[in-house]
Amino acid sequence: MAAAPGGSAPPAGPSPRLAFSTADSGGGMSGLNPGPAVPMKDHDAIKLFVGQIPRGLDEQDLKPLFEEFGRIYELTVLKDRLTGLHKGCAFLTYCARDSALKAQSALHEQKTLPGMNRPIQVKPAASEGRGEDRKLFVGMLGKQQGEEDVRRLFQPFGHIEECTVLRSPDGTSKGCAFVKFGSQGEAQAAIQGLHGSRTMTGASSSLVVKLADTDRERALRRMQQMAGQLGAFHPAPLPLGACGAYTTAILQHQAALLAAAQGPGLGQVAAVAAQMQHVAAFSLVAAPLLPAAANTSPGGNGPGALPGLPAPMGVNGFGSLTPQSNGQPGSDTLYNNGVSPYPAAYPSAYAPASTAFSQQPSALPQQQREGPEGCNLFIYHLPQEFGDAELIQTFLPFGAVVSAKVFVDRATNQSKCFGFVSFDNPTSAQTAIQAMNGFQIGMKRLKVQLKRPKDANRPY
């Protein structure tokens, strides 16, 4: 073997480029922490997450790779606290923000390290990258104010990364804007210093400065709006006293029920079952849809009109459920005003459908992971912030959800931005596909499709 220019042979090792010593196995996290000669990091420095690194490389081995982009403040390889084993990822903080941006631009998914099948991941850590605590919504601006005016207003509070005035299609200002600062502290300082502090020229009230809504909050709000549009139903506050809890639940789900009932293949029997299904989700199966006093005529032997409330749960000409004249004894405690409820009565032809939903289902059974064939959906392009709870809330208006799961990376505990939802019937699954496939959340559009049957690829 030829000698190296310095007169000594290179060390032998399994890797052609990066043959370094492995990290110690003391457990927890071992780090390359700043010494006395290392300057403090900038106030707007970014903490980076580095993934897809060989498990044989420690901080000293990785340092030369990242130092070419700037001075490193801290580099920490993540290790299992119990076993001390390398997790294949690390956290990296540069002294300067620009260094982090350069490293991300040059390395993220651009280079594959020896022994790895996927390119290295270099991106802001979860707590840093979303910018949810740095992006502000600014309302009650003057119509004549542009981006430069807004920048001058917020410049004293720190470094502004983005500034966008919202405009109508004709180019006129909507009187509001988004401002994104370099750090959470700068954003909070701007809120404290400017919110309600002045009234801008041409504005009707004082300046509004607050944290902008997250993608998750916007998505859930759009879902609520869409549910109302599907049913062409506009709920209004009703002074119903003891009826409030019941009618609120009915109002919230009536629009989704109407949309589902009008879908292909759902007849009147299934519509009645769907009524009970949606009411059961709010623990209303064992109780009446409305207290007897609020839905009976003065004579007590027929349904009466409730001001401001449409006939409850009527679908495609199928009438609402008719109350019986006899109430359920011993159930006065369900109401604060002591009004006894009545049991819902069904035509005998629909008894099988109602029986299927007579028991209140739990929201997510732990043992049942999938629904029947044709009821299981794959959802792609979910927002990074979405968890299981948000996924359930998004798809619950379309039917009873058997299970919902967002897939998470085991090493980083970050969402992989896809998951699955299982319904208990194919109609709900098809309705969800029609409504949600292509639905935009943030900068992405959801892709919703049926999961392939397990035996789809098996030869006959």
From Swiss-Prot:
Residues 1-10 have a biased composition (Low complexity). InterPro entries: CELF3/4/5/6_RRM1, Nucleotide-bd_a/b_plait_sf, RBD_domain_sf, RRM_dom. GO terms for biological process: mRNA processing; synaptic transmission, serotonergic; vocalization behavior. Residues 319-336 have a biased composition (Polar residues). It is found in: Nucleus; Cytoplasm. One of its GO terms (molecular function) is RNA binding. The keyword Ribonucleoprotein does not apply. Residues 1-37, 316-336 are annotated as: Disordered. Residues 46-127, 134-214, 375-453 form the RRM domain. GO terms for cellular component: cytoplasm; nucleus; synapse. The keyword Repeat applies. Keywords: Cytoplasm, mRNA processing, Nucleus, Repeat, RNA-binding. RNA-binding protein implicated in the regulation of pre-mRNA alternative splicing. Mediates exon inclusion and/or exclusion in pre-mRNA that are subject to tissue-specific and developmentally regulated alternative splicing. Specifically activates exon 5 inclusion of TNNT2 in a muscle-specific splicing enhancer (MSE)-dependent manner. Promotes also exon exclusion of INSR pre-mRNA. Belongs to the CELF/BRUNOL family. This is CUGBP Elav-like family member 6. It comes from Mus musculus. The gene is Celf6.
